[in-house]
């Protein structure tokens, strides 16, 4: 496919040692040739492909900067088009000046994600691989980066292609049975159809099962610490973060607002939320803090419910009523001051056992991180070689395919084959959309609009 010539700064905004201007399109080499001079090469066309050439960049006769120029010929480039990269010094003024000169000589400003969009449209990568690039760029933890790298490598694409192959073969066999029913063609049996559907459903189920874990490593787990005033919520936040982020005093009600910080637990971003202690109060500011606490609980993925080891109070029971429908763990703090509560009592009132800790003495705090991890992960990801589904679009398309296949299986013995094939084709269409083999232009535009300019 041929497009016009686009250009953008591909490195982050700011000061750095090197900045890169990327040019792509059928006239990219011609455009770059108008603004550079080389002491070694007479023209840009004399510079070998993939050779790092020292050049000088000019605006007409005005010298702008020295740079390294690398050119790539289609289809062997990131976009699949002719591409030129100009690596200049990294100041924003010089980068913007070079970009302006490139635009003045025949290119246009690239839209967000347009380079990767062209790579997709030119068959350099599929849609799921393109989406993996966003995750690699935005990775906040090593775990997400590793998973995104697997997706970029094509691990997810391979699994999707395997499901598609099963469905495509099944549809072909059914249509052959319909079209050549009067000839000597073996008709596919309902049992064979059911076996293929079950195989595809099992593969889809295994992928869907990874989504909650995938979502956790991508978006983070919103984890709210709740309890009555002075139970140790702020101290817990500070200990987990290993820094003094929240103010800690012996005065109940010190924390009056919601404080959020991110904790990395073995590659999973945990958004820790310290909240105001929940109690009846006449203090207007503290009351607002309590209201914000309850709102934080509503959106929580996980709640850390803290009580004290000297006994369960009426306030504890009232607080628990607001979190009992959430995923939660129970911490029993201040064991250094004595324990007047049993696991049986905790389990009877709150539905599960608690973890006894002493923040003041740093006792059993390693169990807290372990409990958080166990509460949020659907599976053990240590040594996990499979790719995790992290993208909601992929999950929704897999669910659609699952629904169509389930419908086909339910109707297998009561509907004719031509009706059955409609559900199978719809399932295949949903599967194809994951890798972009059958996707609307609007969806493509929406996906690539999430990229930054220059990628």
Curated annotation (Swiss-Prot):
Stored Gene3D superfamilies: P-loop containing nucleotide triphosphate hydrolases (3.40.50.300), Probable tRNA modification gtpase trme, domain 1 (3.30.1360.120), tRNA modification GTPase MnmE domain 2 (1.20.120.430)
Entry keyword annotation includes Hydrolase: yes
CDD domains documented for this protein: trmE, TrmE_N
Keyword vocabulary terms for this entry: Cytoplasm, GTP-binding, Hydrolase, Magnesium, Metal-binding, Nucleotide-binding, Potassium, tRNA processing
Cofactor(s) this protein requires: K(+)
Signal peptide: none
Binding site for (6S)-5-formyl-5,6,7,8-tetrahydrofolate: 22, 85, 124, 455
Family membership: Belongs to the TRAFAC class TrmE-Era-EngA-EngB-Septin-like GTPase superfamily. TrmE GTPase family.
Protein name: tRNA modification GTPase MnmE
């Amino acid at each position: 496919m041929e497009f016009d010539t686009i250009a953008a700064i591909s490195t982050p905004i700011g000061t750095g040692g090197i900045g890169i201007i990327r040019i792509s399109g059928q006239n990219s080499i011609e455009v770059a040739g108008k603004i550079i001079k080389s002491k070694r090469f007479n023209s840009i066309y004399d510079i070998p492909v993939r050779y790092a050439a020292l050049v000088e960049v000019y605006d007409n006769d005005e010298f702008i900067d020295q740079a390294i120029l690398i050119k790539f010929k289609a289809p062997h480039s990131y976009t699949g088009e002719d591409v030129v990269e100009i690596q200049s010094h990294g100041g924003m003024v010089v980068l913007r000046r070079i970009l302006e000169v490139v635009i003045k000589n025949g290119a246009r400003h690239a839209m967000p994600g347009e380079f990767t969009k062209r790579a997709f449209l030119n068959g350099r990568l599929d849609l799921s691989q393109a989406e993996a690039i966003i995750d690699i760029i935005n990775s906040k933890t090593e775990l997400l980066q590793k998973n995104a790298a697997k997706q970029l490598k094509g691990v997810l694409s391979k699994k999707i292609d395997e499901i598609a192959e099963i469905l495509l073969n099944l549809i072909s066999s059914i249509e052959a049975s319909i079209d050549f029913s009067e000839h000597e063609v073996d008709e596919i049996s309902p049992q064979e159809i059911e076996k293929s559907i079950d195989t595809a459903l099992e593969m889809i189920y295994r992928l869907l099962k990874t989504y909650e874990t995938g979502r956790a490593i991508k978006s983070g787990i919103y984890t709210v610490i709740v309890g009555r005033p002075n139970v140790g919520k702020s101290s817990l936040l500070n200990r987990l973060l290993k820094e003094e982020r929240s103010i800690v005093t012996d005065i109940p009600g010190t924390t009056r607002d919601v404080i959020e910080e991110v904790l990395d637990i073995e590659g999973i971003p945990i958004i820790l939320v310290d909240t105001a202690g929940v109690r009846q109060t006449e203090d207007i500011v503290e009351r607002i803090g309590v209201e914000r606490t309850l709102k934080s609980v509503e959106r929580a993925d996980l709640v850390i419910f803290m009580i004290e080891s000297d006994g369960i109070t009426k306030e504890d029971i009232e607080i628990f009523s607001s979190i009992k429908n959430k995923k939660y763990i129970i911490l029993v703090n201040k064991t250094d001051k004595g324990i007047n509560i049993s696991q049986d009592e905790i389990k009877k009132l709150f539905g599960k056992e608690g973890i006894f800790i002493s923040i003041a003495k740093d006792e059993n705090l390693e169990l807290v991180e372990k409990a958080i991890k166990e509460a949020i992960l659907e599976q053990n990801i240590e040594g996990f070689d499979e790719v995790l589904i992290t993208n909601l679009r992929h999950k929704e398309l897999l669910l659609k395919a699952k629904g169509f296949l389930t419908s086909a299986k339910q109707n297998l013995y009561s509907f004719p084959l031509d009706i059955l094939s409609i559900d199978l084709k719809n399932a295949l269409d949903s599967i194809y959309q994951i890798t972009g083999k059958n996707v609307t232009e609007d969806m493509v535009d929406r996906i690539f609009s999430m990229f930054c300019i220059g990628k």
